[in-house]
Amino acid sequence: MSCKTKPFGFNHAVKFFIQISFFFFILSTNACMSSKVCSDNDKNCSIQEQIYSIISAPQGIYLYTTQTSYQGNLAAYGSTLDDSLHNICTTNRIFASMINTSCSNVLPVVSTSTSPMYNFGTLYSIPDNTSYPVRGSKGGIIANSWTNMFPSLLMTLEQAGVTSQTFWTFANTGGTYNSADNCIDGTIVGAAGAIGSPTDNSTNWLLSGAPGCTESHPIICLCY
């Protein structure tokens, strides 16, 4: 008595399904290989989230917080304070938890003597119109445009999912450079530095206090 074999087409389909399933399993394993590299909340760890974000992330300027908190000597990570802040934001961009994973232009939301944040539109040509609203990590609108962010916010940074911690700004209300509280241009810890509030949506959100530069705080970065 001979045994009947299943049609070749069926066997081929099964093999193909197993191969493609194994391929996607390897990809997902590599994407989230270790909790030391990617946290559970890191959207860059999820292939599904990456595809979803590219398709669905609305246009805008996205804010994210650094994963690390820093003392006020923020100039220690580059040749100048501006260069150092950019390096900090670029490094932390990799692990930023936000729905827009494809943005590539990164800047620190920190004022310096040469680059006050209110003037980023002129200095760095960031989009400053209602087609590029300022958004939180999940896409919620914080301000209708970059300029509109300084008088007040539509929602706090905590409500927008950006951060629940105070953060270095070295700024006055309105986004100007705080010439008094800036940790001596981010060079020492023996001074004071201006910080912002995650729970204030008034004009004071950029200046909620000026603690000693020995304290550690994250900084907020933008990406578009």
Question: What is each of the regions a protein language model found here?
Answer:
Residues 5-6, 18, 36:
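Generic extreme N-terminus detector
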Residues 29-35:
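N-terminal Sec signal peptide cleavage junction
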Residues 35-49, 55-224:
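Secreted/extracellular ectodomain signature
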Residues 17-29:
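Bacterial N-terminal signal peptides
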Residues 1-14:
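N-terminal secretory signal peptides that target proteins for export/translocation
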